[in-house]
Swiss-Prot record:
Name of the protein described by the UniProt record: Cytochrome b
More about this protein: Heme 1 (or BL or b562) is low-potential and absorbs at about 562 nm, and heme 2 (or BH or b566) is high-potential and absorbs at about 566 nm.
Binding sites annotated in the UniProt record for heme b b566: 97, 196
Gene name of the record: MT-CYB
One biological process term in Gene Ontology: mitochondrial electron transport, ubiquinol to cytochrome c
Predominant location: mitochondrion
Source organism of the structure: Erignathus barbatus (Bearded seal)
Residues that span the membrane, as ranges: 33-53, 77-98, 113-133, 178-198, 226-246, 288-308, 320-340, 347-367
Matches recorded under Gene3D superfamilies: Cytochrome Bc1 Complex, Chain C
The protein's assembly and partners: The cytochrome bc1 complex contains 11 subunits: 3 respiratory subunits (MT-CYB, CYC1 and UQCRFS1), 2 core proteins (UQCRC1 and UQCRC2) and 6 low-molecular weight proteins (UQCRH/QCR6, UQCRB/QCR7, UQCRQ/QCR8, UQCR10/QCR9, UQCR11/QCR10 and a cleavage product of UQCRFS1). This cytochrome bc1 complex then forms a dimer.
Molecular function GO labels: metal ion binding; ubiquinol-cytochrome-c reductase activity
Protein keywords: Electron transport, Heme, Iron, Membrane, Metal-binding, Mitochondrion, Mitochondrion inner membrane, Respiratory chain, Transmembrane, Transmembrane helix, Transport, Ubiquinone
Residues reported to bind heme b b562: 83, 182
Length: 379
């Protein structure tokens, strides 16, 4: 009798994706982040579902409903903080995953890469709208500032902003629709992730060497299921350390003050995982220019395959590109730090230099370094 896992219409899909999947034998821990992102997404959907049972999306009661969840609901505090800090873990895994893709040349799988970029934008939109829901000071002003950026679009900008707001300012209509979108988008992310995986399994995984591993494949289970479980345990350990010991470490104290349209906080800033993009936005004095730079800071990933001038796929044997990659990482950390600082000297200048360097590394230095490395191969 044939094994049910290979014949049953549903189970054979799971089998070909997670059990008998031929996988390169040499993929490192950097390949763990895909499964960790899946775990983060499921965790966020589950905790979010339980929060939505007690949350009210009304400007008068939103803040107090979050307080009610933390004080009165059984284990409400842990659900709320797992959701808030789960978002941070989600973005840590996301940036590691994208960084891995850049380092090892995984962007040559065009469909998988482009779906990944769409996923990144969708997750960022979801996180932004989620940050608005507690209706604290930073929620309100963050929503006001970021949605207002759309007014920089010529001709239709102002109408577009008012259409998104559902009025002439961020108010009840805005909060209600943000809650609706924040609830539905994770399921869109789930569907996109399935498509992402579908395209990945068409080609098979990349590996650290960047050369074809068709001659050396091993089954996903038990080798990588065990490895993924270890990664998951470490992820949950870090998340629970955050949740149980310093749940507000990554949050903003201003968000413990209820939203007040008449009082602007001294420093409006988004969550830490958006600070690098926020710093790029602020470093350009022109409003439309800033918005374009903000979008391009992520969209630039889409042209990574076009800028690939190297004869080798990954950076494993390319020391110049490696140095530039880690310079890019340092630059992003600098931008993250700058995004959280007030707009004053010397932070403005540092932010502008870091922003220029970010685009220069990706658009100019890396392609040139690849050409130099190609020539070194001939020596």
């Amino acid at each position: 009798m044939t094994n049910i896992r290979k014949t049953h219409p549903l189970i054979k899909i799971i089998n070909s994706s997670f059990i008998d999947l031929p996988t390169p034998s040499n993929i490192s821990a950097w390949w763990n982040f895909g499964s960790l992102l899946g775990i983060c997404l499921i965790l966020q959907i589950l905790t979010g579902l339980f929060l939505a049972m007690h949350y009210t999306s009304d400007t008068t009661t939103a803040f107090s409903s979050v307080t009610h969840i933390c004080r009165d609901v059984n284990y409400g505090w842990i659900i709320r903080y797992m959701h808030a800090n789960g978002a941070s873990m989600f973005f840590i895994c996301l940036y590691m995953h994208v960084g891995r893709g850049l380092y090892y040349g995984s962007y040559t799988f065009m469909e998988t890469w482009n779906i990944g970029i769409i996923l990144l934008f969708t997750v960022m939109a979801t996180a932004f709208m989620g940050y608005v829901l507690p209706w604290g000071q930073m929620s309100f002003w963050g929503a006001t500032v970021i949605t207002n950026l759309l007014s920089a679009i010529p001709y239709i900008g102002t109408d577009l902003v008012q259409w998104i707001w559902g009025g002439f300012s961020v108010d009840k209509a805005t909060l209600t629709r943000f809650f609706a979108f924040h609830f539905i988008l994770p399921f869109v992310v789930l569907a996109l992730a399935a498509v992402h995986l579908l395209f990945l399994h068409e080609t098979g995984s990349n590996n650290p060497s960047g050369i074809s591993s068709d001659s050396d494949k091993i089954p996903f289970h038990p080798y990588y299921t065990v490895k993924d479980i270890l990664g998951a345990l470490l992820l949950i350990l870090v998340l629970m350390l955050l949740v149980l010991f310093s749940p507000d470490l990554l949050g903003d104290p201003d968000n413990y003050t209820p939203a007040n349209p008449l009082s602007t906080p001294p420093h409006i800033k988004p969550e830490w995982y958006f600070l690098f993009a926020y710093a790029i936005l602020r470093s350009i004095p022109n409003k439309l220019g800033g918005v374009l730079a903000l979008v391009l800071s992520i969209l630039i990933l889409a042209i990574a395959p076009l800028l690939h001038t190297s004869k080798q796929r990954g950076m494993m044997f390319r020391p110049i590109s490696q140095c530039l990659f880690w310079l890019l990482v340092a630059d992003l950390l600098t931008l993250t730090w700058i995004g959280g600082q007030p707009v004053e000297h010397p932070y403005i200048t540092i932010g502008q230099l870091a922003s220029i360097l970010y685009f220069a590394i990706l658009l100019v230095f890396m392609p040139i370094a690849s050409i130099i490395e190609n020539n070194i191969l001939k020596w």
